[in-house]
Amino acid sequence: MIAPIFAELAKTVGADKDGLPTLVAK
């Protein structure tokens, strides 16, 4: 359930797999 949400978030910020960790760190 959370995976799709994070995927959409990453898309919104234009981030990729590498951007995900950065988003979480924020």
Swiss-Prot record:
Protein's UniProt keywords contain S-adenosyl-L-methionine: no
Superkingdom per UniProt: Eukaryota
A GO CC term assigned to this protein in UniProt: cytoplasm
Parts forming coiled coils: none
Keywords from the named record: Cytoplasm, Electron transport, Redox-active center, Transport
Compartments, record wording: Cytoplasm
Keyword ATP-binding: no
Function, in words: Participates in various redox reactions through the reversible oxidation of the active center dithiol to a disulfide. The H form is known to activate a number of cytosolic enzymes.
Family affiliation: Belongs to the thioredoxin family. Plant H-type subfamily.
Protein name as catalogued: Thioredoxin H-type
Lineage, opening ranks: Eukaryota, Viridiplantae, Streptophyta, Embryophyta, Tracheophyta
